[in-house]
Amino acid sequence: MTEGRCAQHPDGLDVQDVCDPDDPRLDDFRDLNSIDRRPDLPTGKALVIAEGVLVVQRMLASRFTPLALFGTDRRLAELKDDLAGVGAPYYRASADVMARVIGFHLNRGVLAAAGRVPEPSVAQVVAGARTVAVLEGVNDHENLGSIFRNAAGLSVDAVVFGTGCADPLYRRAVRVSMGHALLVPYARAADWPTELMTLKESGFRLLAMTPHGNACKLPEAIAAVSHERIALLVGAEGPGLTAAALRISDVRVRIPMSRGTDSLNVATAAALAFYERTRSGHHIGPGT
């Protein structure tokens, strides 16, 4: 491999071979585990990083347009059909060079970097939606990514963020979501918890998930609103939903538990609620 060589791939791809880990063309992929220099920090470059073939494919299918890709020759071969017509360069390097640039060995073998795009309003993402997940205080990126993956697989139409939520475009959230954080529509509430009232006025029934013993059991509560538009409210690990969010909700619902367990991981609890919604007749469409 010749350092700096630009190769016009047979499929018309812009493939550029890189052997020097200090090559400035790779700066958008540098120090991915750094606390203060990582390129996906909203206060820094604010890039969206896709990691692995499947997540890169989902980025290519999303509204986030890659600025560049960085990976091995093996991953290039796997992605060549997906990259047809993509104008971004593919910086081809060895696994060792990749590790020295990003700061660790990447088994998945390919990264893509995209810029952020303007986010829609809550009104825009819930227009036409029948099932919406509303998150409050979900500040763990892995939980957030899992919720997006669950939402995609279980026919949730959109995600709304209340106060205190993590960044859905953080690399770990995107990776754990398997790229669905780039595809499932989401919006951040500009006025919380007032926008919960806006959802109610738009025809949504607000179902607040809580471990409180006086709440309705989840299966019965979901079945009772099977023909209505619903917003499933999920709170932070530990404290759960705030008193204000619970007060505005229409129904408080709980997952029946056993063996003295009072609650489940927030992503698991959300998945159960999403699944109950599909069991009640809400359509599960073809996968992405």
From Swiss-Prot:
<dbReference type="GO" id="GO:0032259">
    <property type="term" value="P:methylation"/>
</dbReference>
<feature type="compositionally biased region" description="Basic and acidic residues">
    <location>
        <begin position="1"/>
        <end position="12"/>
    </location>
</feature>
<keyword id="KW-0808">Transferase</keyword>
<dbReference type="InterPro" id="IPR029028">
    <property type="entry name" value="Alpha/beta_knot_MTases"/>
</dbReference>
<dbReference type="InterPro" id="IPR029026">
    <property type="entry name" value="tRNA_m1G_MTases_N"/>
</dbReference>
<protein>
    <recommendedName>
        <fullName>Uncharacterized tRNA/rRNA methyltransferase Rv0881</fullName>
        <ecNumber>2.1.1.-</ecNumber>
    </recommendedName>
</protein>
<dbReference type="GO" id="GO:0003723">
    <property type="term" value="F:RNA binding"/>
</dbReference>
<dbReference type="InterPro" id="IPR051259">
    <property type="entry name" value="rRNA_Methyltransferase"/>
</dbReference>
<keyword id="KW-0489">Methyltransferase</keyword>
<dbReference type="InterPro" id="IPR001537">
    <property type="entry name" value="SpoU_MeTrfase"/>
</dbReference>
<dbReference type="GO" id="GO:0008173">
    <property type="term" value="F:RNA methyltransferase activity"/>
</dbReference>
<dbReference type="GO" id="GO:0006396">
    <property type="term" value="P:RNA processing"/>
</dbReference>
<dbReference type="InterPro" id="IPR029064">
    <property type="entry name" value="Ribosomal_eL30-like_sf"/>
</dbReference>
<dbReference type="Pfam" id="PF00588">
    <property type="entry name" value="SpoU_methylase"/>
</dbReference>
<comment type="similarity">
    <text>Belongs to the class IV-like SAM-binding methyltransferase superfamily. RNA methyltransferase TrmH family.</text>
</comment>
<feature type="region of interest" description="Disordered">
    <location>
        <begin position="1"/>
        <end position="20"/>
    </location>
</feature>
